[in-house]
């Protein structure tokens, strides 16, 4: 596959004004997308965004570029990423565009795309867009310019969809829920979803001002959520990120419930009901405790590369339905086409009601292993990861762990680092073993550097 110039694993992202996330580039990006999609026929694209102040500017730029290519635009306004994927399908659009930098702070923003079926754009389409970006922008004749309309009931449509993902007779009437919307795209949606299903909802992070998205709130900063759950005596806390595709939970005792535990709860329930349809997909960074808990049920477990894109790819390859990441990207392919924080939370709430169990009871079957991650500075990360002496050192440690732990080496894709991760039953021993392994690798790195010809 050709090397991408602009697209990363999840669209195009950067610091606003100091990267390609600027009005000039984004206008041309909209035009390029329009040209690739249109291919001579009238097409329609939906655009949604989170609550960053830069979203207004980027939305206008995209709209102008798409119009110049003769593509009609439907503006959704603030809308969670999975909501945009859903509405792309129901509005019969040819593509959906998300303006968001997910869990990042307001200074960043990004553009990512969904195809007509609500899935990620194929690599071939992304490469065609990049090729079009290299051409001179040409506006279609005035009679063929695209029009823009605003979908005023977009939030209501998505709220109804979310509610439809649990059994129609499910009621959350006996649950008190704190929901943290991260001052992001779910601020006007998530509280309504849960309250319309009967829950007593205490919402926080619902006052976006363009600058406070993900700021000391949401799934990446759950301290406020935890405090609120304890303070109001809630049954559960739900922490979403700025664009609503991640979720973490807090139980009534104040314990954090991460993506691995959420995957376990959902997968175990489906397995017990005979509707799991295959196995479960995690990533290279999923806790070994998840693998042990899933396989102990007699359910296959597969690891993908890190990133929800790769989780989705593996699920589709195997025709499985449930997967996700520790960070809270949870994919239920029998319900949605992408990670959806609200939908994942609803699955857990439905299980709590159906089994009449508290969240801490549902997590009792999975024991997360202590994990130590060390970032080892080196200019030889990739060489070290494949070095025979390093591989042997890893094997020796894995033998010592005796099937009750895991070792993972990952060269960083952006920094001169080798990430060394060790998991095991005892936290202090794991920390010690990780440091010993890093010391061994550092010695090998030193010898390797000395043997390399000087430049």
UniProtKB/Swiss-Prot annotation:
**InterPro entries named in the record:** A-D-PHexomutase_a/b/a-I, A-D-PHexomutase_a/b/a-I/II/III, A-D-PHexomutase_a/b/a-II, A-D-PHexomutase_a/b/a-III, A-D-PHexomutase_C, A-D-PHexomutase_C_sf, Alpha-D-phosphohexomutase_SF, GlmM_bact
Can you name one GO molecular function term for this protein?
Answer: phosphoglucosamine mutase activity
Give the record's GO biological process terms: carbohydrate metabolic process; peptidoglycan biosynthetic process; UDP-N-acetylglucosamine biosynthetic process
**Maturation and modification:** Activated by phosphorylation.
Q: How is its cofactor bound, per UniProt?
A: Binds 1 Mg(2+) ion per subunit.
This protein's record includes keyword Cell cycle: no
Q: What is its EC number?
A: 5.4.2.10
Its required cofactor(s), as named, are: Mg(2+)
Q: Name one GO cellular component term.
A: cytosol
Q: Sorted alphabetically, which keywords does the UniProt record give? A: Isomerase, Magnesium, Metal-binding, Phosphoprotein
Signal peptide per UniProt: none
Q: Where is the active site?
A: 102 (phosphoserine intermediate)
Q: What does this protein do?
A: Catalyzes the conversion of glucosamine-6-phosphate to glucosamine-1-phosphate.
Q: Which family does it belong to?
A: Belongs to the phosphohexose mutase family.
What HAMAP family does the entry give?
A: GlmM_B
Q: What name is this protein filed under?
A: Phosphoglucosamine mutase
């Amino acid at each position: 596959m050709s090397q991408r110039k602009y697209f990363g694993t999840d669209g195009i992202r950067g610091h606003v004004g100091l990267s390609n996330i600027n009005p000039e580039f984004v206008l041309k990006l909209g035009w390029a997308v329009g040209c690739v999609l249109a291919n001579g026929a009238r097409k329609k694209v939906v655009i949604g965004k989170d609550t960053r102040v830069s979203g207004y500017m980027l939305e206008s730029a995209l709209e102008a570029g798409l119009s110049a290519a003769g593509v009609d635009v439907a503006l959704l306004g603030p809308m969670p990423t999975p909501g945009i994927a859903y509405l792309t399908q129901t509005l019969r659009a040819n593509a959906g565009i998300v303006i968001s930098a997910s869990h990042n702070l307001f200074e960043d923003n990004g553009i990512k795309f969904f195809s007509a079926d609500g899935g990620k754009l194929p690599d071939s389409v992304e490469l065609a867009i990049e090729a079009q970006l290299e051409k001179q922008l040409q506006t279609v004749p005035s009679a063929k310019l695209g029009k823009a309309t605003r979908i005023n009931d977009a939030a209501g449509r998505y709220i109804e969809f979310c509610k439809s993902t649990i059994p129609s007779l499910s009621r959350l009437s006996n649950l008190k829920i704190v929901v943290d919307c991260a001052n992001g795209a779910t601020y006007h949606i998530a509280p309504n979803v849960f309250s319309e299903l009967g829950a007593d909802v205490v919402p926080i992070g619902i006052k976006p001002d363009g600058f406070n998205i993900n700021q000391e709130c949401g799934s990446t900063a759950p301290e406020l959520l935890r405090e609120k759950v304890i303070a109001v005596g809630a049954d559960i806390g739900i922490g979403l990120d700025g664009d609503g595709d991640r979720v973490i939970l807090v139980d009534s005792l104040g314990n954090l419930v991460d993506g691995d535990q959420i995957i376990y709860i959902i997968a175990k329930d489906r397995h017990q009901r005979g509707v799991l349809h295959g196995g479960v997909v995690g990533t290279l960074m999923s806790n070994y405790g998840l693998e042990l808990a899933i396989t102990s049920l007699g359910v296959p477990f597969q690891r993908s590369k890190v990133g929800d894109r790769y989780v989705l790819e593996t699920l589709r390859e195997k025709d499985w339905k449930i997967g996700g990441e520790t960070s809270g990207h949870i994919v239920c392919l029998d319900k949605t086409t992408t990670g959806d924080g609200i939908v994942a939370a609803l699955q857990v709430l439905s299980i709590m009601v159906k089994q009449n169990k508290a969240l801490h009871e549902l997590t009792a079957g999975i024991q997360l292993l202590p994990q130590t991650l060390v970032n080892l500075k080196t200019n030889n990360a990739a060489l070290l990861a494949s070095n025979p002496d390093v591989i042997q050192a890893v094997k020796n440690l894995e033998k010592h762990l005796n099937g009750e732990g895991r070792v993972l080496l990952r060269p960083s894709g952006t920094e001169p680092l080798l990430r060394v991760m060790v998991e095991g039953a005892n936290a202090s021993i794991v920390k010690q073993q990780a440091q010993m392994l890093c010391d061994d690798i550092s010695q090998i790195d030193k010898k390797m550097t000395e043997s390399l010809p000087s430049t």
